[in-house]
Amino acid sequence: MANNYTRYKFYVIGVGGTGSLLARDLPKLLLGTSHKMMLVDGDTVESKNIERQGYQAQDVGDNKALALSRKINSLYPIECEFDDKYCTYESLFALIQDDKGYVPVIIGCVDNDATRMILEKVFKKLDDVIYIDSANSEYEGNIYITTKKDGIQQSNLRSQCYKFDLDKHPLDVSCQEQAAKGNVQFLVTNAKMAVSILEHCNALIMYQLKEGVQLVNRFETVFYDWSYTW
């Protein structure tokens, strides 16, 4: 997919449970490189987000992408850009076109198939692109890694494996619907998803990325020794 002169720009779409934890560590991979990153999310930090996402009390009321990019830019000598609006096809495609010197790496950390359809549409429009799409429930998840070089696609997109739900884009969801959504997730699951995505980003930078699907189970590598008595 790449050679030693490839420059990547990582677009983290959705900086909630998984995306905010990924964004916290992704800058460390970019230190000393010419790669760039951008956070995209139209959501606002709420006090309930502090427990499971990468935000602190001083961030409450701020846009999530803005709050995280502000932290990253203060901690690391890289430029983390942000877009404080929910992702649309037109907005994401325009952002990518503005940085044509970079191969876009679209990282989907969203919780709705309506946005996934947008991300796949952008992927299909581009000739050179990497798409890392994550999804998880309370205890497990999966990551689809699909690439395209000179218009040739490697591995399947999520929608090519199963039918998407006809859910709503965040822009079309009312405040009441958002409050009633009740999408239960856990910090440990989100953290494991974020680390798994980070591994794929590292593999990409090291020119070792493999396309396909990764299944992530938060209990897979947890071992219990019942012989010990407290």
Regions found by a protein language model. Give the residues of each.
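Conserved beta-strand segments of alpha/beta enzyme cores
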Residues: 36, 79-81, 130
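Short amphipathic alpha-helix with an adjacent loop that forms part of the alpha/beta core around
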Residues: 90-101
